[in-house]
Amino acid sequence: MTPSLCLQDLARLLDAPVQRRSSPADPTTLAWVFENISTDSRALQTGDLFIPLRGERFDGHDFLDAAVSVGVAGALIARDWAGYVPEQLATVVVDDTLRAYQQIALAL
């Protein structure tokens, strides 16, 4: 279990914007709180923060739809991700999702 953080706190920690598609997130979205972090789309639960990681044979960004279908509170997205991002998904846009994950771990 992760200490509770809201998306706005996370964005401050990572010095990164919170977005919905290409527009800034509204105040309600910024206040969304997540208590768990998951890098595995198969283990996601409602209210989690999804951090899609890239590997040699996969890219977690390919599972953003699965994350939305279980009701995640938001996701980190790599700035260079050119694929589909569900419109309703609140995202924190970072240069590298693995590095951001490490920053979160150090802060908590």
Region locations from a protein language model:
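Short, basic phosphate-binding NTP loop
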Residues: T2-L108
